[in-house]
Amino acid sequence: EREQAAKVAQCLRDDGWELASHSWGHLWMGVSGDPQNPYKISDERFYTDTDKWANEVETLIGPTDIYIYPNGNDIADWHPYTDENYRYQYLASKGFRYFCNVDASKPSWIQMGHDYLRMARRNLDGYRLYEDMIQEDPAKKRLSDLFDSSQIFDPSRPTPVTWSYGQTQNETPAEETTASQQ
């Protein structure tokens, strides 16, 4: 399967596609808003996930400098990344230079740093389409500058569309048994 996946990735690249990292485990990589626990996951899980992506995915699809934050959860607030942000430093050390979060509060924004570009993206999925379609306040519609969601949303789709990030995403994984523990 890995060999076939690598061939597919190469075909996509040959056709002009840019591939990106969306992490290995789709974890909340970034800030939590809790002053006692500023990040959603531990540093160890952050480093492990980043390394697993490099070892398990990058080896198949080739190098990329684009990082699309899982769940849109950025590693910093709106202020520019700094050398003190060790998560940014680690991602940069892995070759990432373009960072994309999810921020539907504005049509778009871009931040250019000394050696990175950071931008918001809008998620165009079934959940966002549904939310935009049922929103009655025109000022709160997030996609109306692109299209009328009610013209795209399939009326045969079950509604309401709900979203859950799941219960296990930020839990500490079970400890692995090593040979020395057996």
Which role fits each region the language model picked out?
Residues 1-15, 27-28, 63, 75:
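Active-site beta->alpha N-cap acidic-glycine motif
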Residues 22, 26:
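Histidine-centered divalent metal-coordination motifs
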Residues 30-182:
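C-terminal active-site subregion of NodB/CE4 polysaccharide deacetylases
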